[in-house]
Amino acid sequence: MSGLLCYCRQGFEPELAAELSARAAFVGIAGYARTQRNDGYVLFVCDEAAQLAAKLQWRELIFARQKLVVIAELKGIDPKDRITPILAALEGQQRFGDLWVEHPDSDAGKPLASLARSFGNALRPALRKAGLLTDKPQPRQPRLHICFLDGDHALLAVADSADSAPWPLGIPRLKLLPEAPSRSALKLDEALLTLLTPEEREALVKPGMRAADLGAAPGGWTWVLTRQHVHVTSVDNGPLRAHVLETGLVEHLRADGFHWKPAQPLDWMVCDMVEQPRRVAERMATWVREGWCRNTIFNLKLPMKKRWDETRLCLELFEQQAEKSLIVRAKQLYHDREEITVLAMRG
């Protein structure tokens, strides 16, 4: 068995399968996607998995929460002895720097959570005894993933820690603080964690910067920016939560976010308005093209059908109309629903 294992939001397997197929074809690697709706993962079977993984950077994949290279598929595992076949399948492999035992984030996969936790505790000492796992986690070495699809069915895969999600299942466990104006705050928190590298976050999100939040009410995204000590112009005809205004970092303008423009260039513009995705993409492109902002994070609400086609169309439309040299990344975040979050920054 050789291929890529990618986790995704349950119900978005067709979109991830289409994305992997299109991207693999673009780089000239043949393969096919194996999945079923609501599995919570896609297995892209190909003979050149390592080469494909190197060309498809995790941060560049839209619908993949995690990207792993499969090294074995085990079926019919004896529940009384799962360790022996796993050790046999790993014979000759290099020493791994960490072990994550996982399951798909799906209705069928979640009941396997307790098995994953307990089995990980049993497998670690066996791997160390066999010389397959370091005594302490070593993030610079490849990470071993055991993904249980059922009690007797598992995929063994490896991750490059520099090119994979740093969270089990690819899900950052963010806590919604009581003072957050809305749950949408988690979207921007996750976007900053996922779409930017630590070095980019440090360089691009600094105290004293200026930003606009279009369609800001009740203030979730504005609040996230103020916690980074960014000055925010919040544009919305609706009200903001009082404690957001009390930060002293927020100017609330009662205006239509689709028509407002700043008097001077801003460091950031963020937008989570509920609107047709193509209309949003065009307006965001105008902001970049006119130089109204240097960097932007915005959401695109996807239709129920042909979501991969709409995603590609909107991103192409944005990049064409922006008329700038940009680094563009997009993800369907864990805290997103029927939408994707897009980052665009000056190249």
UniProtKB/Swiss-Prot annotation:
Enzyme class (EC, first level): transferase
Location in or out of the cell: Cytoplasm
Superkingdom of origin organism: Bacteria
Record keywords, A-Z: Cytoplasm, Methyltransferase, rRNA processing, S-adenosyl-L-methionine, Transferase
UniProt cross-references to InterPro entries, sorted A to Z: RlmM_FDX (IPR040739), RlmM_THUMP-like (IPR048646), RNA_MeTrfase_FtsJ_dom (IPR002877), rRNA_MeTrfase_M (IPR011224), SAM-dependent_MTases_sf (IPR029063)
EC numbers, comma separated: 2.1.1.186
Entry annotated with the keyword Transcription: no
Signal sequence region: none
Functional description taken from the UniProt entry: Catalyzes the 2'-O-methylation at nucleotide C2498 in 23S rRNA.
Subunit text: Monomer.
Similarity field: Belongs to the class I-like SAM-binding methyltransferase superfamily. RNA methyltransferase RlmE family. RlmM subfamily.
Name of the protein in its database record: Ribosomal RNA large subunit methyltransferase M
Organism: Xanthomonas oryzae pv. oryzae (strain MAFF 311018)
